[in-house]
């Protein structure tokens, strides 16, 4: 009888802990839902206007101007880390410079509008600013490291491996060009029926591409917030020793990201938990940058470019993230822009009827309209192509663009 009571108490405690973690996850999801919809809608508008076919011709070398263009085009592309990595390989195979392709990849995952919105909502505008300042710094450092350590022979070997066309993840999604095909001014193209269709298709496909990582990130963040005491993180991040914390944060931040398996927008909720736990400002920015180094993506690099280039990318990306983290810590520290309070306080265990609820209702209606357009304009067959071969034809969107263009 006593044993049964103990088991019941343990079961109740475990279920209570799980329930608390799920409650925090649900609360955080509700808090950021409208911002996610807004961010992906704005991203869909940009991707609908930027034609994929024009990108390769602009990325033929690694001059500073080309890297700036590559970064900007990346920011106008998919925020799904897997799709960004696949698209960078596709651009490289079609003749883009390797450094420019990597700059495109970094811009696609770290400088997109939806990431900035979620960072501002969860953590504060300073983190959004740091992300958009630190991203170009990381690309600059990476370009210098490539000049020093990545020779023509290694690039040729990587291109030979890339030409084998081994599949990674989200290949079909990366190969789809869902931009508006008709001619005309920006607003005429955007407000046309094909424009609405393109926006709807990009919006839904982007959501589906990042949904797994977003859910995983929210669940991990909720579990850590519920189960791991802040005292552990404060000790781990040396929070009581500010000078050492500033040194340690950018070093350990990317390592935490690598083993978390969370990428894309999904690592922002976890970043909020780590910030509340005591990681340095530069450390949390380096953590967010490191979604391109999680273990599944490292394995994709090995398939795409070979084991040696994968190790080079691991070393150079990691070094550039650490340096960017240090420079962000120094720059924002000297300008007094680092928040004095660790107030990423979106994780409460209850949902209330407030402005967030109203915004969620409004943007859920917008999302529903885009989903209906996606379904009624022939978008469902595209779902089967998301994980397809990188060399498979993806002309579905072109066909129904013609259908709606009259």
Swiss-Prot record:
InterPro entries documented for this protein: DUF318, UPF0718_permease
Entry's localization field: Cell membrane
Annotated knockout phenotype: Mutant is slightly more resistant to copper. Mutation does not attenuate growth in mice.
Protein topology in the membrane: Multi-pass membrane protein
Induction: Repressed by RicR. Induced by copper.
UniProt KW keywords: Cell membrane, Membrane, Transmembrane, Transmembrane helix
One GO CC term on file: plasma membrane
Transmembrane annotation, as ranges: 30-50, 67-87, 111-131, 132-152, 208-228, 246-266, 278-298, 312-332, 361-381
Family: Belongs to the UPF0718 family.
Protein name: Putative permease Rv2963
